[in-house]
């Protein structure tokens, strides 16, 4: 039984380290498939919105890649973990409300409990996609190891996850990335 959103034809759960290119990949897919076919859902959206409300912060600034967001990241992670411990599906339910496109790209899946929730709610139409990039590539995109962030469950929760359905290598080779995206797009179109 699908909760509150439409019934998707395909749910792709994207995960990866900070600065691996998850947003870049999901936005590239959406631009090729069209926003009428494909919705990008961000688990961090409702988390940041609720956190901003409870702490009197600027929600929009928490959503961008700014130093403002980074200043609150550690506390936001702790707060989000407390919410998830009380209700593992809390943020998952929030992001699917009212979504009507047939393809859902969840751009920031970070925990096994997120994957389990989508698999239980949507079954066989759920696929996992891991975006990987070398540390060097991530550093070129501005990543710097931050204790309490890069070693927290929000970054490491899927490091030992069983097999991902798809692995996208995003090390900076545009042609190789393009080939992988085309293969994934073919699969997505076969499910529509």
From Swiss-Prot:
Its EC number(s) = 2.7.4.2
- Where does this protein hold ATP? 17-23, 141, 171, 180
**GO BP annotations listed:** cholesterol biosynthetic process; isopentenyl diphosphate biosynthetic process, mevalonate pathway
- Where is it predominantly found? cytoplasm
Provide the reaction this enzyme catalyses: (R)-5-phosphomevalonate + ATP = (R)-5-diphosphomevalonate + ADP
Q: Name one GO cellular component term.
A: cytosol
Pathways per UniProt: Isoprenoid biosynthesis; isopentenyl diphosphate biosynthesis via mevalonate pathway; isopentenyl diphosphate from (R)-mevalonate: step 2/3
Which keywords does this chain's UniProt record carry? ATP-binding, Cholesterol biosynthesis, Cholesterol metabolism, Cytoplasm, Kinase, Lipid biosynthesis, Lipid metabolism, Nucleotide-binding, Steroid biosynthesis, Steroid metabolism, Sterol biosynthesis, Sterol metabolism, Transferase
MF-aspect GO terms: ATP binding; phosphomevalonate kinase activity
Compartment(s) of residence: Cytoplasm, Cytosol
Q: Would you say which domain of life the source belongs to?
A: Eukaryota
- Repeat keyword on record: no
Q: Which residues bind substrate?
A: 170
What does the subunit section of this Swiss-Prot or TrEMBL entry state?
A: Monomer.
According to its UniProt entry, the function of this protein is described as: Catalyzes the reversible ATP-dependent phosphorylation of mevalonate 5-phosphate to produce mevalonate diphosphate and ADP, a key step in the mevalonic acid mediated biosynthesis of isopentenyl diphosphate and other polyisoprenoid metabolites.
| Name of the protein described by the UniProt record | Phosphomevalonate kinase
Supply the gene name: PMVK
